[in-house]
Amino acid sequence: MEQIEQHILRLRKQLRHWEYLYYVEAAPEVPDSEYDRFMAELRTLEAERPDLLTADSPSQRVGGQAQSSFGQVRHEVPMLSLDNVFEEPGFLAFDKRVRDRLKRDDDMTYCCELKLDGLAVSLLYENGELVRAATRGDGATGEDITANVRTIRTIPLRLQDHDNLPRLLEIRGEVFMSEAGFLRLNETAKREGSKVFANPRNAAAGSLRQLDPSITARRPLTFYCYGVGLLEDGELPESHWERLQQFKAWGVPVSDRVRRCTGSAAVLDFYRQVHEARLSLGFDIDGVVIKVDSLALQQRLGFVARAPRWAIAYKFPAQEQLTRVRDVEFQVGRTGAITPVARLEPVLVSGAMVSNATLHNADEVERLGLMIGDTVIVRRAGDVIPQIVGVVTSERPAEVRPVAFPTQCPVCSSDVERVEGEAVLRCTAGLVCAAQRKEALKHFVSRRAMDIDGMGDKIIDQLVERELVKTPADLFRLNKEILTRLDRMGSKSAQNLLEALEKARQTTFARFLYALGIREVGEATAVNLAAAYGTLDALIAADIDSLTGVQDIGNIVATHVRHFFEETHNIEVIQDLLSPAIGIRWPEPVAAPVAASDNPFAGKTIVLTGSLSSLSRDEAKDHLVALGARVSGSVSAKTDLLIAGEAAGSKLSKAQQLNIPVMDEAEMMRLLGESSDA
């Protein structure tokens, strides 16, 4: 070996060592100037001898040319998601399921890790050298982000030398951004007039998907390993915890907050400690991941619903923040319900900026004791929907004022009423009210109703505000000249919308009923009504006694249906829609679904949860309903079956607690295929 080649190898080895100490261990050994001197010498030598330049050299981190797109990467070992639990009983139920399946009475040993709030990635090392990096994608196929990942300082381009390196090793983990790095990034973006990110997770994801790797190189990204995928021509320990220690020895970053726990009590103790310390970690986490430590036991437990039976994510309760109520405004919905909405001083809650929260009704405002100007506790229910959970009365200023509910509709000034037995106020004007008209039309054109593609909320708003549309039938009277006068509506878009309107004229009885917007009549109820009566005339003639005999329809829903068809205006709207000029039609009569004796879905109440890869949730729902199932949106003791797709959450946990049978997507698709062939 030449002397210059030996010197280059020594420089690379020294620089890798210093990078590991600086970026992974946070324990720099030399001043930056010394590191820079070695790096400059390495680059000079590599420039002199380009034949000695290798992809894993420390000099090659900061990316080169921009890409035009990301290539696709098929994961040899699928990157599965985890089932979630949100409360202690959910974890204890998981622990019991594990022990029951393994037929063990003794305590299980688990490896507990932080659930990082970043982006899952796969790192493929060949003979210790990083050769490919990919996003998780849909679990089966991800995007090739090798050029960008090579710029992340905490990810080794070459594993530290050891005799036992596998030929192929796929390390999996999370790329994320620290809170301090996120704040610095946004401060710089503000100064430069660039995009400001909402939260560290979005910043990390956006940084990894830059087509120009030099941009990624300037982003403060870091990485923690949490597992392994593909492994060829090599061996690893049979304990997950010991595997993480092995990866750490090879120079791969592993969180120092990984603990091996024996028994559920030890796991719960670790969870509580992490929950208390979460705000001091310096980066976002949203729970603890709990894995059976033994690889042999993991293999025995296997997988279900595209998630392992041997692991669970125990997520933290929704994060809460304090903010102030600036005002309370009132919104009018499709059925005239007047809903109070709190306007808040913007506050970051669980990674999202929150400035509004619904207060539901007067009873909720009274229960909270809320006044305008109050300091309130805000959380995002399920880390999604903002809600006010309490008022900090000790912080109440002198100038607060009560929430005054309107006596007239805030949109059309019509009288409002509160029906006995209901908590909400309602505008009495019906579709005369512009707000109700807008919301009714938005419902009518929605995907699960008449499915008029391209007829978005902003188009409906313009049509109503310009008094171009008053009833659903008016939508079908629109022409290209009218549409092109709307904002942001060109000739091509107008033509596409007219074609969508034409297509929507052919529908189904159930969709049409749902589109009418009858109170309390959702998709499943509309299907049941269509199946029970077959024709619109028969349904219109049905009395309350007849209606209450239909599956899942009680007295309240029956009363709403009866009242809807007793309104002259509603009958006029229906007649207009069905007239030859408009031409809404569907196959008649609609017969009740006939369930084959061997159809496993007939007569069952089924809940769908998680995302499906073979078809959409809506398509799955249509198939199940066609086979005589009732598809519900929530799990209860009356649920017969839960079908769990990828990333199934609290519904899966509740079903398991209630001992409700769970079916994965593959089994559902198999049975749907058999039922359709029958």
UniProtKB/Swiss-Prot annotation:
Task: Report the NCBIfam families cross-referenced here.
Answer: dnlj, PRK07956.1
| Binding-site positions, NAD(+) | D32, S33, E34, Y35, D36, S81, L82, E113, R136, E174, K291, K315
Cofactor dependency: Mg(2+); Mn(2+)
Per UniProt, the enzyme's principal EC class comes to ligase
Lineage summary: Bacteria, Pseudomonadati, Pseudomonadota, Gammaproteobacteria, Enterobacterales
A GO cellular component entry from the record: cytosol
* Keywords, in A-Z order: DNA damage, DNA repair, DNA replication, Ligase, Magnesium, Manganese, Metal-binding, NAD, Zinc
Q: Which GO terms describe its molecular function?
A: DNA binding; DNA ligase (NAD+) activity; metal ion binding
Give the function comment from the record: DNA ligase that catalyzes the formation of phosphodiester linkages between 5'-phosphoryl and 3'-hydroxyl groups in double-stranded DNA using NAD as a coenzyme and as the energy source for the reaction. It is essential for DNA replication and repair of damaged DNA.
Q: InterPro entries attached here?
A: BRCT_dom (IPR001357), BRCT_dom_sf (IPR036420), DisA/LigA_HHH (IPR041663), DNA_ligase (IPR001679), DNA_ligase_AS (IPR018239), DNA_ligase_CS (IPR033136), DNAligase_adenylation (IPR013839), DNAligase_N (IPR013840)
Q: Which organism is it from?
A: Sodalis glossinidius (strain morsitans)
Q: What family does this belong to?
A: Belongs to the NAD-dependent DNA ligase family. LigA subfamily.
> What does the record give as the reaction this protein catalyses?
NAD(+) + (deoxyribonucleotide)n-3'-hydroxyl + 5'-phospho-(deoxyribonucleotide)m = (deoxyribonucleotide)n+m + AMP + beta-nicotinamide D-nucleotide
UniProt protein name: DNA ligase
